[in-house]
Structure formats: structure tokens, C-alpha cells
Swiss-Prot record:
Subcellular location: Nucleus; Cytoplasm
Ranges of compositional bias, category Low complexity: 103-119
Residues that, per the record, bind ATP: 144-152, 167
Reactions accelerated catalytically: L-seryl-[protein] + ATP = O-phospho-L-seryl-[protein] + ADP + H(+); L-threonyl-[protein] + ATP = O-phospho-L-threonyl-[protein] + ADP + H(+)
SMART domains: S_TKc (SM00220)
Assembly notes: Homodimer. Homodimerization is required for intermolecular autophosphorylation, kinase activation and nuclear localization. May interact with components of cullin-RING-based SCF (SKP1-CUL1-F-box protein) E3 ubiquitin-protein ligase complexes. Interacts with LEF1, MEF2A, MYBL1 and MYBL2. Interacts with the upstream activating kinases HIPK2 and MAP3K7/TAK1. Interaction with MAP3K7/TAK1 seems to be indirect, and may be mediated by other proteins such as STAT3, TAB1 and TAB2.
GO biological process: cellular response to osmotic stress; intracellular signal transduction; negative regulation of TORC1 signaling; negative regulation of Wnt signaling pathway; peptidyl-threonine phosphorylation; positive regulation of receptor signaling pathway via STAT; protein phosphorylation; protein stabilization
Domain Protein kinase: 138-427
Name of this protein: Serine/threonine-protein kinase NLK
Annotated gene: NLK
Gene Ontology CC: cytoplasm; cytosol; nucleoplasm; nucleus
Length: 527
């Protein structure tokens, strides 16, 4: 994983400070100095095509050519039975499942319709599909990760041969709460338009509503995540740290401008590709900020090590400052290559925080519950020990520690915002490097680099969650989500659907969701 070189560029800094676009003077220099390569060790095979597959083995996905003879159709059906993703028909929706129409996940379908599913590809084709023989040396699908609520697989999009990620949102319609949560995440993934925030490229065609149990979302495939990089033995330069932190805050500024709290920022939810481009992912716990302080918010959020003190202390109302606390913990972890506050329990978590920050004032604890305040006041009075942050690593410079101390503030109202953190001088080099050779918003010409007028864009309008207020039954939400997915189908692209007969799909459908360690944390009950 390498970073390209970036020279200090006066015009770019002028563009940032003045808010105007600028072209770099002179030619853009191309002697790029490559930083240590950080390949994700156990994901290395993403870069290498696997051994050739034959029809009938678990090939990833297949488009199917329009059949001209019954023999060709039979061959196509055999190949498609192995493929997990297939281009669907343009109008596959009927009042009830039509003969030969795949009803969707095999697990949800009656046996006789499962048998008909094998004939799906034979029954409906689309003229934009390619010849199946072109696609036979595709890597098999494989699981690549588990989120708060869902499992992610890498697959090949049969329409263009690109590797993409496929996220299964399972058990969507168990109850009204899970329906609303999944619909919220789905709407967010379709709303996001930012290079440092993962968004939906596509949603697989749903089956007829009677068989509609799972939702499959296609997103960009990223090679690694910050957790894997931090625990790897490869060195992380200060340039890596700056460009990662810059992108985390750039994505967070966008999310917060949309009025969204992520509520589970941790290294494993920060995806990184081989060029060091970073994207915030997993919005299973995200929600719109609650401006009415009298309304209670759930405390079952944020993985413990990254949980802000106000949540640990049982505050019933919190702000997007909880995400900034998590970023501070990650910043320290990037510098020190170990978890900053690694406690066995939520109470010990709070004690480790006060060891570093000192005993908080009553004002800083004003939103805490009485039991948590009593715990702090019972204990010894602690002095802050912030200078210990300089011992994280040689990269913990004055500028780095200064910014870190603005993030790790006990009182959420005094914690720095994503917008203000981006203006900190520590991130100037990260911004320069990102916009000189990593971003999609600036471009190079023969006379130099043309910079965007807005380095850290926000969204307008905000994400609107008023749709949730009127959701009253599982059946109603199911119909609304089904309709929403149909409306999302991107223009004239061939819609994709799951092939429930493929071996890969059967493995996918049975893969477990969220390992026990990944489950959302339980709330701390203060006596």
C-alpha cells in the first residue's frame, strides 16, 4: 500500500486558504517517492486471479448470452447454476411468482419454486449480456468481513467484470425495529455521495415480495481496513498517519454535515484500498442527530475501546462529538500501534480515561447519570497526565499531540469538531498529499494540477429521517423497502439478481452474521 509523493504546493495551500481553485505552476512532477507498501496479508489474493474455473464449479458470477438453441440454453443454465450473480430481467415483477422466475434466496422459497430457479436464466435473458465463456476464470466468491449487522462477500459484477463487495443484510423483517434500522442504513447508503464514505453502487433485484427476506447491496471493494493495517508488522510513516486521519475527518465532516452520527467509528470500520484511499463504512448503528435534549438515545453504541466518556457515564443524550472521541482514540492507535484505552469493562474503560485526562469537573459531567458521577467522586482526585502522549512514538510531535488533545476532551461541548480539526496545521500535509495524487475531485493537466474549489465538501440538504415516523408494521415497511429498491435501479444498467442454485450462494446464505466479538456493546447499568 503506497502513497505517492507530494511536494508542498503554495498554490494548493492558497486554494485551500482562499477557497478558490488553482492550477499548480509548472509541470506536475512525476518522480513519486513510494512509501512502504502495506498489502493486507490475508487479503493478498484479491490481486491475483485464481486458477481457471470450469462450468459447474463455483465461479463467482455470470452474465448469460441470449440463447439461440436449446443446447446453448442448457450450457448457459449449467454455467449460470455455478454463478452467484446473474443479470436479471428488465421487468421481472409479477403479481405472483411467474413460472420459472427465481423467487430469491433458496432458504425462503418453497421446494417446487427452488427447482424452477435453475431454469431462470434459461427463461429470461437480456441483450446486453456477454458470452458465458468469457467469464470462466473468475475468482470464487469469498467472505471478506462481518459488520455490526451483516456479512460482506467479494464478487464479480458480470456486467463489467469488476470486483465489488456484496453485503447481505439478513433477517431484515424479523420485527419493526430491525425493519426500520435496515431501511435507515439502506437509505443512507443510497444518499451518500463522498469519496471517503462507502455508498451503494447497486442493490440486487428483490424477488417477488412474498419471498423477500434479505437485501443485497453492492459497494466498492476495498482491500483492507485500518485494524488490519495497525496490527500488521509493516511500518506506518507519519505521512500515512496524516493522510489516513485527514480522510477520516473529511468523511466525518460530510456525515456530520448531513446530521448523521455514525456511532461505531473504529479501525475495522475504516476501509482502505491499495492506494491508501480510506472510506468510512458500516452504518448499521448510525442515526440522525437528536436535537431535542429531552429525548433519550440508546446507549448500546460504539465498541467499548472507542466509546466516549459521556456514553460510558450513562448520558441519555449525546452529540456527534462521540464520533470525534473515537477518532482521537484511533489517531493515538495509529501513532502508538496499540489500543489507547484497552479496558476489560466499561467502568475500567472510564478509569483509564480519567488516568490520562484527570478527574473531570462537575460541569464536564453534567449529562452523566448519578451513579457514574458518584463513582468518579468516590475515587481519588487525579491530575491529568497528557504529556505521556508524547511517548506513543517518535511521530507524536507537538502538532500531533496538540490535535490529539483537542479530540480527547472529556466535556463533549468542548471537543473539537471535524470541521475545525481539518483546519489544524497537523493535517496540511495530509490534505496536500490526498489532493495532489489520491482524490477524484482534482485533476492534472499538461500545465499542472487543477484543484477543486472545495477540499472538504459538505452535503446539502441534510439526510431526512422523517420517513421513519410513519412506519407502523413489518408488512408496510417491507412493501416500502421493496418499492424503494425498484426505484433505485440505476438507469439502463442490466439489473443484477442472485442465483440461488450456485454453490457460492449456498455458502453465502449459510455464513454467520457478526461474530460474538463484533456484536453491539451492551449498556452499562450504573447503580
Amino acid at each position: 500500500m503506497s502513497l505517492c509523493g507530494a511536494r508542498a504546493n503554495a498554490k494548493m495551500m492558497a486554494a485551500y486558504n482562499g477557497g478558490t481553485s488553482a492550477a499548480a505552476a509548472g509541470h506536475h512532477h512525476h518522480h513519486h517517492h513510494h512509501l512502504p507498501h502495506l498489502p493486507p496479508p490475508h487479503l493478498h489474493h484479491h490481486h491475483h486471479p485464481q486458477h481457471h474455473l470450469h462450468p459447474g464449479s463455483a465461479a463467482a458470477v455470470h452474465p448469460v448470452q441470449q440463447h439461440t438453441s436449446s443446447a446453448a440454453a442448457a450450457a448457459a443454465a449449467a454455467a449460470a447454476a455455478a454463478a452467484m450473480l446473474n443479470p436479471g430481467q428488465q421487468q421481472p415483477y409479477f403479481p405472483s411468482p411467474a413460472p420459472g422466475q427465481a423467487p430469491g434466496p433458496a432458504a425462503a422459497a418453497p421446494a417446487q419454486v427452488q427447482a424452477a430457479a435453475a431454469a431462470t436464466v434459461k427463461a429470461h435473458h437480456h441483450q446486453h449480456s456477454h458470452h458465458p465463456q468469457q467469464q470462466l476464470d473468475i475468482e470464487p466468491d469469498r467472505p471478506i468481513g462481518y459488520g455490526a449487522f451483516g456479512v460482506v462477500w467479494s464478487v464479480t459484477d458480470p456486467r463489467d467484470g469488476k470486483r465489488v463487495a456484496l453485503k447481505k443484510m439478513p433477517n431484515v423483517f424479523q420485527n419493526l425495529v430491525s425493519c426500520k434500522r435496515v431501511f435507515r442504513e439502506l437509505k443512507m447508503l443510497c444518499f451518500f455521495k463522498h469519496d471517503n464514505v462507502l455508498s451503494a453502487l447497486d442493490i440486487l433485484q428483490p424477488p417477488h415480495i412474498d419471498y423477500f427476506e434479505e437485501i443485497y447491496v453492492v459497494t466498492e471493494l476495498m482491500q483492507s481496513d485500518l485494524h488490519k493495517i495497525i496490527v500488521s508488522p509493516q511500518p506506518l510513516s507519519s505521512d500515512h498517519v496524516k493522510v489516513f486521519l485527514y480522510q477520516i475527518l473529511r468523511g466525518l465532516k460530510y456525515l456530520h454535515s448531513a446530521g448523521i452520527l455514525h456511532r461505531d467509528i473504529k479501525p475495522g470500520n475504516l476501509l482502505v484500498n491499495s492506494n491508501c484511499v480510506l472510506k468510512i463504512c458500516d452504518f448499521g448503528l448510525a442515526r440522525v442527530e437528536e436535537l431535542d435534549e429531552s429525548r433519550h438515545m440508546t446507549q448500546e453504541v460504539v465498541t467499548q475501546y472507542y466509546r466516549a466518556p459521556e456514553i460510558l457515564m450513562g448520558s441519555r443524550h449525546y452529540s456527534n462529538a462521540i464520533d470525534i472521541w473515537s477518532v482521537g482514540c484511533i489517531f493515538a492507535e495509529l501513532l502508538g500501534r496499540r489500543i489507547l484505552f484497552q479496558a476489560q469493562s466499561p467502568i475500567q474503560q472510564l478509569d483509564l480515561i480519567t488516568d490520562l485526562l484527570g478527574t473531570p469537573s462537575l460541569e464536564a459531567m453534567r449529562t452523566a447519570c448519578e451513579g457514574a458521577k458518584a463513582h468518579i467522586l468516590r475515587g481519588p482526585h487525579k491530575q491529568p497526565s497528557l504529556p505521556v502522549l508524547y511517548t506513543l512514538s517518535s511521530q507524536a510531535t507537538h502538532e500531533a499531540v496538540h490535535l490529539l488533545c483537542r479530540m480527547l476532551v472529556f466535556d463533549p461541548s468542548k471537543r473539537i469538531s471535524a470541521k475545525d480539526a481539518l483546519a489544524h496545521p497537523y493535517l496540511d500535509e495530509g490534505r496536500l498529499r490526498y489532493h495532489t495524487c489520491m482524490c477524484k475531485c482534482c485533476f492534472s493537466t499538461s500545465t499542472g494540477r487543477v484543484y477543486t474549489s472545495d477540499f472538504e465538501p459538505v452535503t446539502n440538504p441534510k439526510f431526512d429521517d422523517t420517513f421513519e415516523k410513519n412506519l407502523s408494521s413489518v408488512r408496510q415497511v417491507k412493501e416500502i423497502i421493496h418499492q424503494f429498491i425498484l426505484e433505485q435501479q440505476k438507469g439502463n444498467r442490466v439489473p443484477l439478481c442472485i442465483n440461488p442454485q450456485s454453490a457460492a450462494f449456498k455458502s453465502f446464505i449459510s455464513s454467520t452474521v457478526a461474530q460474538p466479538s463484533e456484536m453491539p456493546p451492551s449498556p452499562l447499568v450504573w447503580e
